[in-house]
């Protein structure tokens, strides 16, 4: 199975071209795969693809500086989740969205949140986009999809943020490596 895993240089190259990729974590951790793309490349077609083919929760991975500048608070002040995933309150763009759930609305919310000029008044809570705060130090501190998405975007010369979505099988179970390989060959090549 190792031959199906791309070297990090290839992943960074894909990210620099605005391409989506699958990030797989260790078997002893979550043993799951996420669709990942630098957030600046997450248009409505990407969001729709993630919703349709990933089927998991679509999240916005942000560094701590952006979380702070947007005034986002953590969803829980006493995080007791297994991997201490740092979800913030959900968000929506203040302007330009309808109900907030469409692929277009979520893409607009993401673009608004990651803009270099964005401020806390540009977004509202609750919403249909779920930010996650990456730990400072990235994957060297926490080996999670959140930190990897931010690190890879940064290494690719992109805005240091990513959009991630867990990949589930048709029956609602989590996709594991054999299924993730099939998803990659079917949709991302």
Explain the meaning of each model-derived region.
Residues 43-102:
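Glycine-rich, N-terminal phosphate-binding loop and its surrounding beta-alpha-beta segment
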Residues 1-36:
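N-terminal glycine-/serine-/threonine-rich phosphate-binding loop
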Residues 186-189:
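Conserved small/polar residues in nucleotide/adenosyl-binding loops
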């Amino acid at each position: 199975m190792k031959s199906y895993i791309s070297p990090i240089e290839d992943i960074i190259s894909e990210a620099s071209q605005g391409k989506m990729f699958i990030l797989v974590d260790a078997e002893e951790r979550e043993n799951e795969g996420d669709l990942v793309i630098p957030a600046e490349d997450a248009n409505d077609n990407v969001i729709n693809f993630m919703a349709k083919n990933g089927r998991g929760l679509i999240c916005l991975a942000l560094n701590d500086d952006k979380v702070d500048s947007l005034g986002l608070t953590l969803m829980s002040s006493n995080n007791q989740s297994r991997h201490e995933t740092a979800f913030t309150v959900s968000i929506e763009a203040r302007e330009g969205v309808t109900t907030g759930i469409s692929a277009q609305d979520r893409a607009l919310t993401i673009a608004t949140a990651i803009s270099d000029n964005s401020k806390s008044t540009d977004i509202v809570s609750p919403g249909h986009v779920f930010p996650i705060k990456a730990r400072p130090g990235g994957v060297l501190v926490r080996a999670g999809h959140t930190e990897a998405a931010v690190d890879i975007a940064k290494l690719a010369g992109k805005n240091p943020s990513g959009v991630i979505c867990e990949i589930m099988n048709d029956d609602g179970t989590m996709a594991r490596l054999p299924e993730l390989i099939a998803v990659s060959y079917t949709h991302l090549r």
